[in-house]
Amino acid sequence: MAHIWLLPLIFLVCILLAVFNHKKHPKYRQFPCPPGFPIIGNLHQIGELPHQTLWKLSKKYGPVMHLMLGRVPTVVVSSSDTARQVLRVHDLHCCTRPSLSGPRELSYNYLDIAFSPYDDYWKEVRKLCVQELFSTKQVHSIQPIKDEEVKKMIDSIAESASQKNPVNLNNKCLELTVSVVCRTAFGVSFEGTVLNSDRFNKIVREALEMLGSFSAADFIPYVGWIIDVLTGLQGRRERSKRDLNAFFEQMFDLHKEGKKEGNEDFVDLLLRLEKEEAVLGNDKLTRNHIKAILLDVLLAGIDTSAITMTWAMTELARNPRVMKKVQSEIRTQMGNRSMISFEDMDQLEYLKMVIKETWRLHPTTPLLLPREAMSEFDINGYTIPVKTRLHVNVWAIGRDPDTWKDPEVFLPERFMDNNIDAKGQHFELLPFGGGRRICPAIYMGTTMVEFGLANLLYHFDWKLPEGVEVKDIDVEEAPGLTVNKKNELLLVPEMRRSCG
């Protein structure tokens, strides 16, 4: 009978908390804000694909929208103008990251680039990566690896073409990026090694899921961690960290034993800097720093390029006119050469438009990683208090009718008469983010996508499987920190006769 008082007591506590919050934060009333519940706020409205849910809410509440996610005040911006205010005008006010359970666990307490707070350490590690890992010189130096791995992909697809078998392009694009990244970062080929096992793919998938998963501890203070333990999320995070740690140690052992192949790779470079006692911020470079940096290289490098290539091929299959036009450009430029070179990419203007249009409709990270306000500032007359989390919904910006004519139509020609690029200075198109937290590997990622797509489109014509029509190709999204195509993209390759 004692439990009969429990529900009324909980209800009373919720009411008191709601009243307390209302009085404590009167300035939040000025924000357009969907109604929420005590304790959980608007968490129940987020859904499996938050960028889509927030886009729908922004249609009603505007491009600057306030939410309470649990006990965390959150502002979502959904237009190019408000994104410009966050990423350029007020960048220095909000370029740090909030403390989040998944990133803290997997990044060795924020020793990486993506999730590290804005401080001297972050500045130094970013500078190191820009100069040593992602520089133009480094991108050019790994081109022979790309050439070899693309050749393997083409040969594999050619075998399917000879038998008229459909190809799973989700898998092919992922295999290519995994192979290139693993050889570049670890000096180890994907094919015929431990990296070729399901185990490796599961490690990568699980780590990405843990970085992007909802953690109650991040939104509900004091008791949220209990929910994470009871749901098993905390246990999964700990296992994911152990698996990643074991993988990195295995890579270090291969380098110590001299069993890796090729020239100096990322691990070689970082181990050399560790030996030289390089300083990052106030700390010397340690093995944990190296693991955290490699985590960013591994997860971001593999996933984002593969996802963009998959979405591009999806949209081309849905739009035969565009497919024909981009193939014509590539084949006219290449003639009958057997292989495309890196230097050829500069001449493929329409291909670049296709990729931009893919980024517009299918940004790999539809919600940029969250920022946190370090000092108070205003957007469109609304005050953003300290400790407010900020999300830039680039998926919504790509569908904003005030910015794009016919935003749901895949039309690469929209980039023909403007200078919009993806380097973070044009806030209509932000696949790599913007401001101080822009992705440092833009050039490496862009060249990987361009080179992979150009070869797929040069060497093969792509047909739909028997019984499948263009209208049957879906664009459903899989949930996650990065958003891939939910269902497989199966297309039948036909070898181009003049280069076969």
From Swiss-Prot:
Residue positions binding heme: C439
Pfam families registered for this protein in UniProt: p450
Enzyme class per UniProt: oxidoreductase
Gene Ontology CC terms: membrane
Main location: membrane
Subcellular location: Membrane
Record's keyword terms, sorted: Heme, Iron, Membrane, Metal-binding, Monooxygenase, Oxidoreductase, Transmembrane, Transmembrane helix
Cofactor dependence: heme
Gene3D superfamilies: Cytochrome P450
UniProt-listed Enzyme Commission number(s): 1.14.-.-
TM region positions: 1-21
InterPro entries documented for this protein: Cyt_P450, Cyt_P450_CS, Cyt_P450_E_grp-I, Cyt_P450_sf
Topological type in the membrane: Single-pass membrane protein
Similarity-based family: Belongs to the cytochrome P450 family.
Protein name: Cytochrome P450 71B35
Organism of provenance: Arabidopsis thaliana (Mouse-ear cress)
